[in-house]
């Protein structure tokens, strides 16, 4: 897996990050809830027209991302347990598409002409040619993207991507099969 630094500027993004939970909470509040996790998804979908009138379109589509992403996370977990790499990559890609289209955390709304993460995602998809998968990483808004690159394409991918995103922007990561562990100091 590569992490690609797309050289986005995070210095003025506090309002963009804060808008995501605020808008999701506005949808929850319409139903008398504090958080979307307290709301059954089917109730949300049955009341879309009313929710749009009382919140905003962006709040509604961000709430949709919340509901679908939680289901997708369970499916991704199952795919990993079953070592189904193809299904994992498909779900990973769908998650990325949902972030782009519904969560809308790829570029700041006040700067539509500067989209370094969008360009990096476009380039990654093109370079992968239908293999592997890519998506925004972390909280989004242009910092880094994650890219699963087949081993036989890794060097070429990095070379071509760095022509677009800059020298030393591609970082190859290794993922341990054991997950997080606690390191303890030997007390002698």
Regions found by a protein language model. Give the residues of each.
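N-terminal pre-core extensions flanking Radical SAM catalytic domains
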Residues: 142-145
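C-terminal nucleotide
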Residues: 1-135, 147-188
């Amino acid at each position: 897996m590569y992490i690609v630094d797309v050289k986005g500027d995070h210095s003025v993004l506090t309002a963009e990050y804060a808008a995501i939970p605020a808008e999701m909470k506005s949808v929850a509040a319409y139903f008398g809830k504090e958080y979307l996790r307290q709301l059954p998804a089917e109730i949300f979908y049955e009341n879309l027209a009313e929710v749009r009138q009382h919140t905003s379109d962006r709040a509604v589509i961000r709430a949709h991302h919340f509901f679908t992403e939680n289901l997708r996370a369970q499916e991704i977990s199952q795919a990993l347990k079953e070592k189904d790499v193809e299904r994992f990559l498909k779900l990973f890609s769908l998650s990325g598409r949902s972030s782009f289209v519904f969560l809308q955390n790829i570029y700041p709304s006040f700067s539509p002409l500067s989209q370094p993460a969008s360009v990096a995602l476009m380039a990654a998809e093109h370079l992968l040619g239908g293999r592997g998968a890519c998506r925004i990483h972390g909280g989004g808004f242009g910092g880094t993207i994650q890219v699963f690159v087949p081993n036989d394409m890794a060097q070429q991918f990095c070379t071509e991507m760095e022509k677009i995103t800059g020298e030393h922007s591609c970082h190859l990561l290794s993922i341990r099969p054991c997950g997080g562990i606690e390191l303890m100091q030997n007390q002698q």
